[in-house]
């Protein structure tokens, strides 16, 4: 066959397209992924026939599917489909704009070549349409004023050239093309008063009036034709005018030019206005605007925007970040940013803001206003964009901290790629591969295995932490695994979570300042939940799957969510309670814990852990902030790629069933959003002793950042930045002329290759291991850091998730109460962030 890589890529696209055709043929309304695959694969098939042109296929692509053939969200998610195909005259790009633009598609064309039956349009029954638009931006019907408080002048400009001339917003106007004639003296130190990154175009012979405003900041002109190079002052003005005359630049004095200042006055003749909706489309939402997170019912409102309207930094042809404009001159790498993310909406436990993010030496250097201080006000001193600065465009995107999954069974290395593709940048857990022990418990037991696990993950582009086995009632072996590199220990009932083991393990933890994670005794073999709590002796401990379906004292382990020294977490199979949650759990549990259906006691053990009422209570406890962390329990009763999506599914369900939180207004869900994002970012970082390095979008922390389109928030990131470098991203056909043609999928980037993956990441170990210099002994490329400040933690240290209700559980009915109030919600029959987005 002699297949090239691009042909293999297209085979995957074809398979997805044929799958979509099969679903369409049986009357299933397609989701986003299916619709894209069908349209793109059909374009390739028609191109192969060689009978249609690119233009004809661009038109045909708009007719294949209609609104009735796709789920209601799809027309809002799908703006264009691009694919490259082989035509008789070679490889060509086909772009289908607005592919879902009619009520019904031409199904015979959609199924052309598949030999599948064409379904009747009656199969696509009308359904109750959901008017929720994924990722929509909600703005007030009002305008913003640009460049307020600046000196302004209106000048007449005539083009005497024979070709078009286009001038960008931040180009120093005195420096423009010599064939534009106007009063250059009055234009000194001025630029166009138009939206940042837009332009004014002069066709040959055009004569038009333009409004100019003064440059701000240090008021230094650089670049252009260098006729006015230097600070704006009278001396330099005369030198500039001499250069204008001597170099033949068009100049014509305009004595009666209108001059004044821009101001907060709708009638000011110098003002330029932009409607909030247009502003949001160009630069992303601003203060007071709201964004829907994916297809959930959650609305995030921008609390603060660091941008100065009219001086936004945007990159591209004719845009702002160019030499002497948004990009400064004469600032060496030492004082300019390595990378800037422009105009991003940041969703973090600290707040929901809009800002530029500056990255330097792999760290978040600053959050605020970036740009060129020579022409802009408000540029942070450590956020200078220079010739050594890379730009990541954040306009219209959401940035969050990389997620932390702190309940990982290292069963297979492939879970790493699933994790990073979903937005996870830190993994904490234990294991050695698909051994029986690792399938059930998060323990890397021996020092040799600890060394090998640290070495085997050394080049992988995530932060890693490994937990040793803590199930021992004597101390010696625990000291050894901690010195070998364990950053925590795991107590698990499958190894023994008896009071003696608990007490010994916590005693060792106090000595080494590490966290203890516990899966308590479902069997109640050595005692009930109160006996385990007594064994804690008020010492800090992290309780895994604190509801109990994932394991723990039956039926009342959930009581620990009200204990001050306990840091409780959920695992994601029970997030949230849905109509199918109970039915899937029995077999999941039997496989995970090496149980036998033929043994009655094994079945009884399994059934004792699966309780609808306690799972419902878990929903409520997460919503009130009594459960502080959500993690996966990867491949051992948990899904590593769904930590983020299931967190937001829980938030959506709870808002739908209980309404807004008291801390939220009727207009936004900011507090609920901040509470839930803390569950997989800052709180697991605090609980495990590395919040000084990762866990939030804050200055000084590792630049582990995830970028999302609002419409795909919580499902499929646009880009994952690891240690300041792009590590994983949504990229299309590698052979294509541009990066967007299908198949677009999450792919490893340069930040994962060679030595970069390790260099951009951290291996977390104990202080004892760092003192042993395990990084040198093991030959690790990764930065190695010790966890710390764990042993004095309490629930009150869990950000926005510090509630301490008194919890009771009826041992017969399993009903749960908190502070005397029944905790009960119904199961969800549908959840967001699911069928609209995923192929399977």
From Swiss-Prot:
InterPro entries: Amidohydro-rel, Metal-dep_hydrolase_composite, Metal_Hydrolase, Urease, Urease_alpha_N_dom, Urease_alpha_subunit, Urease_AS, Urease_asu. This is Urease. GO terms for molecular function: nickel cation binding; toxin activity; urease activity. P-hydroxymercuribenzoate irreversibly abolishes ureolytic activity, but does not inhibit the ability to activate platelets. Also inhibited by acetohydroxamic acid (AHA), a chelator of Ni2+ and Zn2+ ions. Signal peptide: none annotated. Urea hydrolase involved in nitrogen recycling from ureide, purine, and arginine catabolism. Is known to be highly toxic and lethal when given by intravenous route, producing convulsions and other signs of central nervous system intoxication associated with the high levels of ammonia formed in the blood of mice and rabbits. Is neurotoxic in mammals, when directly injected into hippocampus. The lineage of its organism: Eukaryota, Viridiplantae, Streptophyta, Embryophyta, Tracheophyta. The keyword DNA damage does not apply. One of its GO terms (biological process) is urea catabolic process.
């Amino acid at each position: 066959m002699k297949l090239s890589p691009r042909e293999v890529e297209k085979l995957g696209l074809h398979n997805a397209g044929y799958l979509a055709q099969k679903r369409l043929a049986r009357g299933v309304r397609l989701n986003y992924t299916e619709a894209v695959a069908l349209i793109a694969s059909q374009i390739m098939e028609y191109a192969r026939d060689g009978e249609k042109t690119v233009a004809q296929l661009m038109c045909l692509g708009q007719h294949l599917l209609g609104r009735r053939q796709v789920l209601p969200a799809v027309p809002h998610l799908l703006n264009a489909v691009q694919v490259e195909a082989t035509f008789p005259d070679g490889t060509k790009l086909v772009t289908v704009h607005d592919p879902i633009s009619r009520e019904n598609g031409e199904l015979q064309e959609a199924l052309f070549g598949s030999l599948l039956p064409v379904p009747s349009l009656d199969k696509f029954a009308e359904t109750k349409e959901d008017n929720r638009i994924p990722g929509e931006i909600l703005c007030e019907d009002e305008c913003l004023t640009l460049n307020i408080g600046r000196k302004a002048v209106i000048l007449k400009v005539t083009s005497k050239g024979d070709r078009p001339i286009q001038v960008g917003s931040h180009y120093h106007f005195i420096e423009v093309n010599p064939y534009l004639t106007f009063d250059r003296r009055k234009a000194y130190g001025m630029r166009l008063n138009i939206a940042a990154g837009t332009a004014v175009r002069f066709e040959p012979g055009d004569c038009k009036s333009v409004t100019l405003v003064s440059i701000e900041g240090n008021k230094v002109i650089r670049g252009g034709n260098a006729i006015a190079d230097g600070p704006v002052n009278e001396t330099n003005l005369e030198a500039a005018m001499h250069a204008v005359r001597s170099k033949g630049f068009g100049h014509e004095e305009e004595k009666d030019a209108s001059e004044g200042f821009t101001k907060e006055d709708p009638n000011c003749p110098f003002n330029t206005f932009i409607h909030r909706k247009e502003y949001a489309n160009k630069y992303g939402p601003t203060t007071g605007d709201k964004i829907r997170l994916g297809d959930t019912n959650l609305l995030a409102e921008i609390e603060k925007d660091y941008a100065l309207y009219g001086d936004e930094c945007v990159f591209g042809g004719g845009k702002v970040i160019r030499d002497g404009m948004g990009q400064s001159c004469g600032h060496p790498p030492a004082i300019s940013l390595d990378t800037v993310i422009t105009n991003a909406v940041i969703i973090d436990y600290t707040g929901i803001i809009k800002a530029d993010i500056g990255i330097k030496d792999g760290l978040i250097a600053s959050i605020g206003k970036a740009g060129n201080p020579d022409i802009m006000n408000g540029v942070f001193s450590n956020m200078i964009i220079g010739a050594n600065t890379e730009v990541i465009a954040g306009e219209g995107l959401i940035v969050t901290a990389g997620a932390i999954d702190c309940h990982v069974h290292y069963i297979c290395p492939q879970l790493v790629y699933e994790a990073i593709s979903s937005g996870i940048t830190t993994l904490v857990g234990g294991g050695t591969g698909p051994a029986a022990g690792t399938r059930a418990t998060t323990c890397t037991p021996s020092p040799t295995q600890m060394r090998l696990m640290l070495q085997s993950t050394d080049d992988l582009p995530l932060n890693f932490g490994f937990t040793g086995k803590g199930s021992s009632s004597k101390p010696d072996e625990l000291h050894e695994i901690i010195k070998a590199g364990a950053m925590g220990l795991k107590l698990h009932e499958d190894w023994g979570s008896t009071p003696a083991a608990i007490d010994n393990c916590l005693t060792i933890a106090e000595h080494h300042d590490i966290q203890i994670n516990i899966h308590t005794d479902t069997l109640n073999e050595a005692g009930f939940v109160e006996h385990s709590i007594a064994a804690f002796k008020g010492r800090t401990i992290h309780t895994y799957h604190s509801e109990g379906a994932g394991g723990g004292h039956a039926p009342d382990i959930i009581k620990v969510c009200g204990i001050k020294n306990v840091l409780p977490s959920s695992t994601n199979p029970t997030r949230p309670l849905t109509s199918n949650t109970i039915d899937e759990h029995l077999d999941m549990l039997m496989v995970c814990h090496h149980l036998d259906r033929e043994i009655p006691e094994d079945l009884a053990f399994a059934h004792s852990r699966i309780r609808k009422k306690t799972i419902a209570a878990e929903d409520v406890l997460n919503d009130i902030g009594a459960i502080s962390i959500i993690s996966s329990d990867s491949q051992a009763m948990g899904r590593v790629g769904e930590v983020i999506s299931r967190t937001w599914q829980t938030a959506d369900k709870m808002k739908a069933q209980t309404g807004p939180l008291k801390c939220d207004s009727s207009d936004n869900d900011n507090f609920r959003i901040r509470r839930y994002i803390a569950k997989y970012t800052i709180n697991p970082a605090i609980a495990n002793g590395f919040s000084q390095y990762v866990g939030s979008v804050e200055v000084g922390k590792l630049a582990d950042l995830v970028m999302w389109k609002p419409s795909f928030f919580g499902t499929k990131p646009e880009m994952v930045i690891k240690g300041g470098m792009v590590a994983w991203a949504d990229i299309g056909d590698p052979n294509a002329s541009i990066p967007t043609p299908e198949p677009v999928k999450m792919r490893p980037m340069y930040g994962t290759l060679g030595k970069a993956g390790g260099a951009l990441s951290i291996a977390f170990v104990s202080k004892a291991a760092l003192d042993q210099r395990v990084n040198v002994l093991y030959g690790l490329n990764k930065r190695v850091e010790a966890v710390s400040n764990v042993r004095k933690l309490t629930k009150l240290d869990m950000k926005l998730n510090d509630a301490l209700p008194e919890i009771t559980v009826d041992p017969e009915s399993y009903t749960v109460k908190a502070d005397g109030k029944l905790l009960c919600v119904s199961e969800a029959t549908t959840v967001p962030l699911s069928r609209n987005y995923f192929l399977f």
